[in-house]
Amino acid sequence: MFAVIRTGGKQYRVAKDDVLEVERNGGEAGDKIDLEVLMLGGEGGTLKVGAPLVDGAKVKAEIVEHTRGPKITIFKKRRRQNYRRKNGHRQDLMLVKILDIAG
């Protein structure tokens, strides 16, 4: 059984015992969270599609750890104007383990 969940403005296809990296949205390591289910697939080709969410479907997950993504560099420049800006960014992420898909 699989589910398509939405978190952090992105969609992920998950199955039981998957570990994925999503944007941090609160909670501490070891906390249990529920995720929004957009689509739910089962054995035998059955598929439930939500509008926008599937009624009664839940994906339970556990926060494994908090991490940070790779550093990216933002550089802005306007030629001949002596305008240069250099900035860096690292996204806050968390590792999530899918415990159960109920639907």
Curated annotation (Swiss-Prot):
What is this protein's name? Large ribosomal subunit protein bL21
Organism of origin is Parvibaculum lavamentivorans (strain DS-1 / DSM 13023 / NCIMB 13966)
Which cysteines does the record link by disulfide bonds?
none
Q: Which domain of life is it from?
A: Bacteria
| Function noted in UniProt | This protein binds to 23S rRNA in the presence of protein L20.
Give the family this protein belongs to, as stated in its UniProt record.
Answer: Belongs to the bacterial ribosomal protein bL21 family.
Assembly and partners are described as:
Part of the 50S ribosomal subunit. Contacts protein L20.
Q: Name one GO molecular function term.
A: structural constituent of ribosome
Q: Biological process (GO) annotations? A: translation
Its GO CC terms?
cytoplasm; ribonucleoprotein complex; ribosome
Q: Which UniProt keywords apply?
A: Ribonucleoprotein, Ribosomal protein, RNA-binding, rRNA-binding
Under InterPro entries, the record lists: bL21-like, bL21-like_sf, Ribosomal_bL21
Q: Which NCBIfam families match?
A: L21
